[in-house]
Curated annotation (Swiss-Prot):
This is Vimentin. Residues 96-131 are annotated as: Coil 1A. Homomer assembled from elementary dimers. Identified in complexes that contain VIM, EZR, AHNAK, BFSP1, BFSP2, ANK2, PLEC, PRX and spectrin. Interacts with BCAS3. Interacts with LGSN. Interacts with SYNM. Interacts (via rod region) with PLEC (via CH 1 domain). Interacts with STK33. Interacts with LARP6. Interacts with RAB8B. Interacts with TOR1A; the interaction associates TOR1A with the cytoskeleton. Interacts with TOR1AIP1. Interacts with TOR1AIP1. Interacts with DIAPH1. Interacts with EPPK1; interaction is dependent of higher-order structure of intermediate filament. Residues 103-411 form the IF rod domain. It comes from Rattus norvegicus (Rat).
Length: 466
């Protein structure tokens, strides 16, 4: 039938294929119109209707619908909108009844199809609501959540970077202080080593002096021994001379007794002996004094050298202990410096690794933000496509509603199950009066839309008489 061909062809243009599938279009809207007129007579049937569309730069679509070919055996008879003249019922033949029956079937099919359209529109509206809710959720929660996470992560990264920077500065200050301490200790070590060398050289000179003093003491001891031997020899010689002199004196005394006239030799010998004894005593005293003075000088020099040697040994031991303690301290400072440098290198490596990880995290978050933006854009495009489909469906439903209302007003008969469609309110479009002459009417209707709004609508009629 013609109405079925109109609805089927327009549905295929809208959704493609059967009536259960849909194909959204983002840039096109479709408008289909159909006019149906009837002529009373032996053959009252609607002519086939075709819908053609073409795109124009202004977004206008032209729908052509051929008018109903009317054949009438009763010219001048018209169907009114409010009532039906039942006096002409006898003139309606069996073909008209069949046509009415077919029209009822077609209207019932249109009713079912409209119900399917309404269900689909409701489903699409629900999908639109779901998408709008998701879009609002993405706009609200997604942005705030990602922004908060990003800001929190950036604050944590900045805090860690500041902490690592402070730790690095503190470690560098400690390293500089330790380097200064090491330089100061090295200088002190050099000074101590110089003092040690000076002390060792002084000790070496003292040792040479001690050796010289020892040699001098040995020489003096030998001289003392030789002098003592000489003194003993002189004493022995003196005693022998005294004995000889005493013997001579005794002999002379005897001679004196015999010869009184001889001179007094005893007094002369006594004088000589006294002179020799005084000379010997003087020499012995001088030798003892010289020996004592020399021994005292040597003892004093030895004691002085021993004190200097002992002091030098004590200083050497003290310097050795200081050198050992400083060496241990330098080794400890070297170990501490090495450990600090190793810790600093590890901290720098960890800092570089954490910075790289944070950069990766920032890149990943930026990628997620970009993906969310792309997903939001995709949802917006899908929502726009669904809005375009819904608008096209609304236009087609309005067109079918106008057709049905025109048919209802023409035949002035209630349609079965038509109240269950819950159609939206639209303005009724009155059908033009059709002459009973046999003619073909070509209706060209141009509808211009922009952003889903109808901005211009024109119609042109072309009549071709048969």
């Amino acid at each position: 039938m013609s109405t079925r061909s109109v609805s089927s062809s327009s549905y295929r243009r809208m959704f493609g294929g059967s009536g259960t599938s849909s194909r959204p279009s983002s840039n096109r809207s479709y408008v289909t119109t159909s006019t149906r007129t009837y002529s009373l007579g032996s053959a009252l049937r609607p002519s086939t209707s075709r819908s053609l569309y073409s795109s124009s730069p202004g977004g206008a679509y032209v729908t052509r619908s051929s008018a109903v070919r009317l054949r009438s055996s009763m010219p001048g008879v018209r169907l009114l909108q409010d009532s039906v003249d039942f006096s002409l019922a006898d003139a309606i033949n069996t073909e008209f009844k069949n046509t009415r029956t077919n029209e009822k079937v077609e209207l019932q099919e249109l009713n079912d199809r409209f119900a399917n359209y309404i269900d689909k529109v409701r489903f699409l509206e629900q999908q639109n609501k779901i998408l709008l809710a998701e879009l609002e959720q993405l706009k609200g929660q997604g942005k705030s959540r990602l922004g908060d996470l990003y800001e929190e992560e950036m604050r944590e990264l900045r805090r860690q970077v500041d902490q690592l920077t402070n730790d690095k500065a503190r470690v560098e200050v400690e390293r500089d202080n330790l380097a200064e301490d090491i330089m100061r200790l090295r200088e002190k070590l050099q000074e101590e080593m110089l003092q040690r060398e000076e002390a060792e050289s002084t000790l070496q000179s003292f040792r040479q002096d001690v050796d010289n003093a020892s040699l001098a003491r040995l020489d003096l001891e030998r001289k003392v021994e030789s002098l003592q031997e000489e003194i003993a020899f002189l004493k022995k010689l003196h005693d022998e001379e005294i004995q000889e002199l005493q013997a001579q004196i005794q002999e002379q005394h005897v001679q004196i007794d015999v010869d009184v006239s001889k001179p007094d030799l005893t007094a002369a010998l006594r004088d000589v002996r006294q002179q020799y004894e005084s000379v010997a005593a003087k020499n012995l005293q001088e030798a003892e004094e010289w020996y004592k003075s020399k021994f005292a000088d040597l003892s004093e020099a030895a004691n002085r050298n021993n004190d200097a040697l002992r002091q030098a040994k004590q200083e050497s031991n003290e310097y050795r202990r200081q050198v050992q303690s400083l060496t241990c301290e330098v080794d400890a400072l070297k170990g501490t410096n090495e450990s600090l440098e190793r810790q600093m290198r590890e901290m720098e490596e960890n800092f570089a690794l954490e910075a790289a990880n944070y950069q990766d995290t920032i890149g990943r978050l930026q990628d997620e933000i970009q993906n969310m933006k792309e997903e939001m854009a995709r949802h917006l495009r899908e929502y726009q496509d669904l809005l375009n489909v819904k608008m096209a469906l609304d236009i087609e439903i309005a067109t079918y509603r106008k057709l049905l209302e025109g048919e209802e007003s023409r035949i002035s008969l209630p349609l079965p199950n038509f109240s269950s469609l819950n159609l939206r309110e639209t303005n009724l479009e009155s059908l033009p009066l059709v002459d009973t002459h046999s003619k073909r009417t070509l209706l060209i209707k141009t509808v211009e839309t922009r952003d889903g709004q109808v901005i211009n609508e024109t119609s042109q009629h072309h009549d071709d008489l048969e």
